[in-house]
From Swiss-Prot:
Chain spans, region Sufficient for binding to the extracellular domain of PRK2: 80-83
Signal peptide: 1-23
Physiological role: Promotes pollen tube growth. A C-terminal peptide is cleaved from the propeptide in the stigmatic exudate and represent the major form of STIG1. Binds phosphoinositol lipids. The binding of external phosphatidylinositol 3-phosphate (PI(3)P) and PRK2 by STIG1 induces a rapid intracellular reactive oxygen species elevation.
Subunit and partners: Interacts with PRK1 and PRK2 (via extracellular domain).
PANTHER family named among the record's database cross-references: PROTEIN STIG1, STIGMA-SPECIFIC STIG1-LIKE PROTEIN 3
Species assigned in the record: Solanum lycopersicum (Tomato)
Organism taxonomic ancestry: Eukaryota, Viridiplantae, Streptophyta, Embryophyta, Tracheophyta
UniProtKB keywords: Apoplast, Secreted, Signal
Protein name listed in UniProt: Protein STIG1
Outcome recorded upon mutating residue 80 to A: No effect on the interaction with PRK2
């Protein structure tokens, strides 16, 4: 019990943000809840909505982010939950804002493809199987 009281006292005096790994991120200024807790994440970086500052109207910042996103490339990027995402590679915004690839597919060039079967994206995006080969379980094998 003394250890818990000591830990709470140290955390209360600390100015370092505290991260709680349970689907939520919490610190002294920001608070948000991860709405994608049921999604299996790969080792690739996944774009999530940024934390929102409590008690502050962020509309000016949000507008700036979306305008900057459109300036980068109106046809390749999208402002999704106030975050600029790449429509050619983002699984949650593949080809257009909000179009989510189903489990087992990957966003390659703005199209959701099954990299285990697709001859033009075998095992990874843009990995084309040679003529006479088929994509089987993500590997190019002789037909």
């Amino acid at each position: 019990m003394d250890f818990i009281i000591l830990l709470i006292a140290i955390l209360a005096l600390s100015s370092t943000p505290i991260t709680i790994i349970s689907g939520s991120v919490t610190n002294h200024t920001y608070s948000t809840t991860n709405s994608y807790t049921n999604v299996a994440l790969s080792a690739r970086k996944v774009v999530f909505p940024p934390p929102r500052q409590l008690g502050k109207d962020n509309s000016d910042d949000d507008d700036l982010i979306c305008k900057t996103c459109k300036r980068l490339s109106e046809h390749r990027t999208c402002c999704f939950n106030y975050f600029c995402v790449d429509l050619f590679t983002n699984r949650f915004n593949c080809g257009s804002c909000g179009l989510v690839c189903i489990v087992g597919t990957r966003c390659c060039g703005g199209i959701c493809v099954d990299i285990k079967k697709d001859n033009g994206n075998c095992g990874k995006c843009n990995n084309v199987c040679s003529p006479g080969q088929n994509c089987s379980f993500g590997l190019c094998v002789s037909a």
